[in-house]
Amino acid sequence: MTRYCAATRCKNRGGQAAVIQRKVSFYPFPLHDRGRLQEWLRNMKQYKLYPTKHQVLCSDHFTADSFNIRWGIQYLKPNAIPTLFSFTEKIQDIAELELTIKEGTQDGVKVDTDTVPSQDFCPNVTNNLSHGFDTDEYVDPDDKQVYLKNTIDGITVSQNKTKDLYVPNSEYEIQPHLITPSKFRQTSVENMIVSSVADLNSQSNQVYFELQTDQNYVAENVDTFQVDHFSDVQKETFPLSLVKQTKQMDAEKDSVITIIVPGGQDGSAISDNLQFTSSEKLGFENDANSTNEILESEHSYCRQITDRHYLRQKIAKLQSKIAVLEAQENATLSRLRLLESVIAKLKQENLLSDEKLKILENCGSSVDIVIV
């Protein structure tokens, strides 16, 4: 694995041709010596760094008296401490940062010098953000206007002056208007979109439900609206829950609910085309039964294709084999019993022969005594 120097602003790494020519070597941190490790980190100005056994420092950060050369190999002394570190680039970065802060103040943007800017300033663009509705229609003129102001830490609220909100890396500007939730009512559900429709002549205690299709808009003056079923683009049928108006809404001019129905069909054709017939129900039941049969045939040990007569013959053969094995087992058991009886008889005969030998020896000794 390639070794990299853990010091900041140091670009030495193992395997470089320049490193090989200069004979730069790498040494691990003294993890076993805590005091020496703290001195290393203090000289590196890395107080929060806790190195691992894989992190190393190159020989450029040590003085010449920190090494012992034996047999042409450069060894680091056990008490060596790195002292050669360069922090000039960091000072240059700070100078560049101060220069950018001064340039920002010259352009008319005030920047706090104590904090580091993390956003890029963009020019003032007069394009409005569009969210699918006009904000002026939903702003209450009686409410107090709240304005947004851009700072370096975030967005602050101001009630005295009007400031432009600068969005980093964007082409839009948010105008100083605030949408109040008291006048804006919008209902959004899956497959249902609520939008605003301008120039409506509504009466009191009436609600306009607009059925929006891909081609036209149909507005109806009704108290309740019911949708039984609807179909999607692929002509697949599935039920939809009933949408009912259970209570009368406030008599306001902007209370409009728009429902988008896919497929480009009228409201009357929605419920007529989507009634399940008995044949369709039977078709669904047959499909379910066929799937169950397929699962049974796949996961059963006996396939449905085989015949019962063949299975009975196979069972009879297995039973005959079992009977033969039982007979062989009985025969082997009888043979074992016979062998046990023979062994017992031989043991008895052996005992008898031993007794006969002893008797003969006694007789022979008695005859010898008589002869003497």
Swiss-Prot record:
Xref: InterPro entries: THAP_domain_protein (IPR052224), THAP_Znf (IPR006612)
GO molecular function: DNA binding; zinc ion binding
Signal sequence range: none
One Pfam family cited in the UniProt record for this chain: THAP
GO terms for cellular component: nucleus
Zinc finger annotations (THAP-type) as residue ranges: 1-85
Record's keyword annotation contains Cell inner membrane: no
Protein name: THAP domain-containing protein 5
Gene (name only): thap5
